[in-house]
């Protein structure tokens, strides 16, 4: 059987804060105002043991402080500081901290090899459903974020959250929105297809998205999205990943100790996952948090460190 390749990112997630002004009905991550903010000493204490461990990506994943909150500047400075420490220790940051201003995106571009924001579903209808109390989930705000990332030339990850009350037509519309943005800017490296997976902290009583439904969305996405966009599926949220790979998915995302967004669903052990995939003819390989064809879009100051990681990854692939 010919072996095919599927990738993952050896990652560790840092959460600056779970405080978030959104109250999405399906969320198992957020906390109210007053939740702890990560302190500088904590960042170093968490990252230092990871040096030399094989972890490359530091995923900075944060709750959102409202743009008009007087603490917004302090919140954003904390995120910048976390990225700077990660770079200092030799890691490659990727930040997803919600909807940002153009200037905030420009600032993070200097400290991250890529950024991310889930488009989720490009439909205002859900503002009367699971996004009723989530002001930053207005689709126009999120598509603007993807547009700005393209204008700035930032390698970008986005995705759909599936099974949150959307229709099949809305899924297709969302994929076509992403495809149009990619046609304009060429900056989108991957699209995550994330099935809603109920957790113990959410307020919405929605059912999980079935594997058969997800399989159909993967096939549709591969038909609609440009070929250079990789389709990602989260291995801890699906039953058997192999049919999804056969349908066109080629990445399993960042795999680390804990899935902080879906804490009820443990990440698989990479070695066991690799064995399982190998039995089906797939080779599991690590990747960086920016895809090779977008390396040149990464900020000049980050190119030496990125080059070191790219060379190390290429060397490992031939030994």
From Swiss-Prot:
Swiss-Prot/TrEMBL catalytic activity: 5-amino-5-(4-hydroxybenzyl)-6-(D-ribitylimino)-5,6-dihydrouracil + S-adenosyl-L-methionine = 7,8-didemethyl-8-hydroxy-5-deazariboflavin + 5'-deoxyadenosine + L-methionine + NH4(+) + H(+)
Record EC number: 4.3.1.32
Keyword entries, A-Z: 4Fe-4S, Iron, Iron-sulfur, Lyase, Metal-binding, S-adenosyl-L-methionine
GO molecular function: 4 iron, 4 sulfur cluster binding; 7,8-didemethyl-8-hydroxy-5-deazariboflavin synthase activity; iron ion binding; transferase activity, transferring alkyl or aryl (other than methyl) groups
TM stretches of this protein: none
Co-factor binding comment: Binds 1 [4Fe-4S] cluster. The cluster is coordinated with 3 cysteines and an exchangeable S-adenosyl-L-methionine.
Xref: Pfam families: Radical_SAM
Pathway annotation: Cofactor biosynthesis; coenzyme F0 biosynthesis
Boundaries of every Radical SAM core domain copy: 6-236
Family listed: Belongs to the radical SAM superfamily. CofG family.
Assembly with partners or alone: Consists of two subunits, CofG and CofH.
Protein's name according to its UniProt entry: 7,8-didemethyl-8-hydroxy-5-deazariboflavin synthase
